[in-house]
């Protein structure tokens, strides 16, 4: 039985990796026309919350009515979708009992990643619209600012997605915080590992500038989130102990009360 479960785990892990590399390969050659399945709903959300109007230009993307902003294939967020899917799948395979890992977690993780990608994309583009008139901040030019904003938003949403997926965990808050390194490792794997394997480092300074930002920003985001959650745990009594310890303490209090009343 153990061998069977191990074989299924290996097969599921292989299926997840096949999905990841298939999506990555598809995105590397896809045009804006082929990415309408994610560009169209993203643009609809942006129009809803910004009041801006966009129209689709074949092979280019969605362009604003004033021709100042383009939602192109690079704005599709497919890399984030891949990262979110891989993170959710890895969490299920690594942190949950093998008996609970049915094959349905793969399409469920993919759908959840798609929904969160739409939300993260919409947020990032709305902020980019607000920053549109800013040419530079301190030593950052518009391209660097756009990159910084994208990395910050995407990793923030990736970590929040992980925390939401852990909401039913029976472990304490501090155990969950320790596992928060999973989204960091997955993010590094897709945003740094795959480009390195593809030889992107040959681009020289541009790649290493990108790699430095990708390495540092998620660490700062994760430290900030962990700090906020730790502070919240200190202020909120029910989060001071792991869940199992809380149950033990509760049972002990109940037994003590019974003894006192008798």
Language-model-derived ranges and their functions:
Residues 1-262:
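Hydrophobic N-terminal alpha-helices or hydrophobic patches in metabolic proteins across all domains
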